[in-house]
Each structure stands twice: as C-alpha cells, then as structure tokens.
C-alpha cells in the first residue's frame, strides 16, 4: 500500500462529443446516442472553415482525426453525423466533474475544460490501494455524470497525465517513477508530453 502523496489525472473521453451526446439525450429522451455511431462535434461547414473538434469512437475507425476539416471527414465517412459545439453545456459538465472530485479532495487543479488533477495526501491511510480507489472513482463518474474518463496515477502531475494517455477509453493506468523504464522507454518519442514535431524529429 502506498502511503505518500498521490496525484490522479482525470481526462474525459471524447469530452465535447460525450457532453453533446448527453445534452441531446437529456433534451430528446430515447434519441440516438451520438457516442454509438460515427459522429463529430464541428464548426461551421458552410464557411468551409469547420473542423472536427471531437469525434466518437466509431468515427475514429474511419480514420477521422481531431482538427481535420469537416469536408475531409465527410469524404471518409459520408454518413457522419455532425453537431455544433455548445460551450455552455461543456462548462456545466466540467463544473459537475470538478464538484464530484472535490468530494474526495480540495486539491483539484484544472488543466483544461475536460482535464484536471486531483491531489491526495497520505493516500494509503485515507483511501487504500490506488488502482482500486481510482476504479471506484471512474465508475462513480460514469454512473453519476453519465460519461467516461481515463485516470492516470503517479506521484507527480507529469507522470499522472502521461499515464492517463496510455490506452483509452474508460481505463485506469499507473506510471510511478519506478515503472518508467518498463512502461515508457519503449514507447515512440511522440508519446512524451509537450514534445512537438520539431523536438520529436531532433530526438529521433
């Protein structure tokens, strides 16, 4: 059992798409769940400047990527359902997530609208085994708020975020300092946090 301070990184899976899907289901009970079909949240298609802001897991199977022009995404998947973003809804859902996290710790540090760190002092004494508690928290978020998250666990924010980015969706991963050689060193350099294209090119 780990007794030191631990940090969780909580990252909402396909946040804008998930939150748009929930809002649609709330307004139209029984309607199609956007998360179960090829769908995307995107900008104004008529201006020809619309891009994919978020996409569903089924949309990913068509090779659709975040930031891709919607016209390109539609060529890959002609049946793609596109909905406009609703940032008021996204802020509301983000606040709901942070409020839930604050039931367990006051140290909730936002990283973006769909990501946050939660810091826990004397973790083992308070919460027991990290992965067991993280899975309990993950399930509570899904059952209470209606969307899934990845949770990364470590002793610092950087490693916790990198852990959360391993495999998605709806999973818990650890990346403690002693696990770095086994879990991180064999990954492509692109997996390094904050490593841009030029940095990756030099490192290769």
How should each PLM-predicted stretch be described?
Residues 1-204:
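Gly/Gly-Pro- and Ser/Thr-rich, intrinsically disordered tail segments characteristic of DNA damage-repair
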